[in-house]
Amino acid sequence: TQKTRIFIIEEKAQNQKASYNEDSFAMLNDVLDWCETYQVYAVVDFHAATAGQSGIPCDDGVDNGQHLYDDEESMERMFLLMEEFMRRYKDRWIIGAYDCINEPISMTPRREELTPKLVYFYEEMIRRCRKIDQKHLFLLNGTQFSSLTYFFDHEFDPEYHNWGISLHAYEMVVPEVASLASVLRTCREQKICLWMGETGGRNEHAWQTTMYEILAEYHAGYNLWCWKTVEGAGCASILNFNVPDEWHLITDYAINGAAKPSYEHAQAIWDSYLECLAVDKCKENTQYHPYLLREGNFEIPAIGYNALPMDSHRGLSDLPNAAGYRLYDRFELVYEKGYHPEPAGFAAPGPIKHPRDHVQL
């Protein structure tokens, strides 16, 4: 995952010229060398565009705004950076694709207004990059957390037709084909590939193995977001690590406005944090591996049955199931003892059930 300010020295990027941070490119080169050594394709994810593209705090936009679309200079800097990547890596076979750009136009009332500007950005980016690199695949993100893809209704790479859609989905998405129907239809109409650019999140084994089974059925690759957060419910990764004993002093100050640690004290905590990252101090989540790698011993929940009739399920019904799950299959569901879905239209008042309730079926 790449943040643009790691690679481009913005203060010097004036008059359509740019100065680049060679140390950052050297680190990326080391990663690509490692990928070649171990035969692991690299998807270079442009996760933060100049001036911000999503409205989400993680892309580091000023005031969390999507200024990429309104600021001509910032958009030009992004084009320059992309062109620089093409020059440096056009012959690097280990790069499988470029994933552009993370969850654009996601938290804003200006979505409809800005979407045409995003379309222009994608079209112009590909046009300029193709003058240098005619080989690599471009994976484009939809709006609203990469979920809305309706505007991919025409050819974005007219000369080479080497592009696809990057979708994101975590456990709040119901694990059924209906959740992917819109983007699958778009990919089918445009004759392009689907890539799940982000998925994983919490250790919801039932959700993950069901969703990955669907993706495999529709020939969609998927990328496990292998490190999401340090602590809490979202902490799910191949390797986890312990935080320093005084880590709470940092988070209490940053999140709750508690007393600010001194510079020296904060630096000591961060130094301890870095020491905790050493691989030999991490814990490997081996129970997580079978679900992610689709090998070894693991279970696919009953709700992840293959859609082909009479193959992995039996019991078609003329009545839809009360849980509202995979209604198009007309499959009669049998619930675990003690689970009683609310009848459609008669649900008790209160919060809507979390989609993960489906794993109780």
Task: Enumerate the predicted regions with their spans.
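Extracytoplasmic
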Residues: 279-361
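Extended, alpha-helix-rich binding/interface surfaces that flank or overlap catalytic cores
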Residues: 214, 218-299
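An active-site-proximal structural segment forming one wall of the substrate-binding cleft
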Residues: 1-3, 14-97, 121-128
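Short, solvent-exposed loop/turn elements at domain surfaces
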Residues: 4, 173-175, 232-233, 307-317
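Active-site-adjacent substrate/metal-binding segments within catalytic domains
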Residues: 1-33, 37, 335-361
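Extracellular glycoside hydrolase catalytic/binding regions
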Residues: 79-83, 87-229, 237-249
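Residue-level recognition of beta-strand->loop/alpha-helix junctions
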Residues: 7, 45-46, 198, 226
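Active-site loop signature of alpha/beta-hydrolase-fold enzymes
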Residues: 11, 49, 103
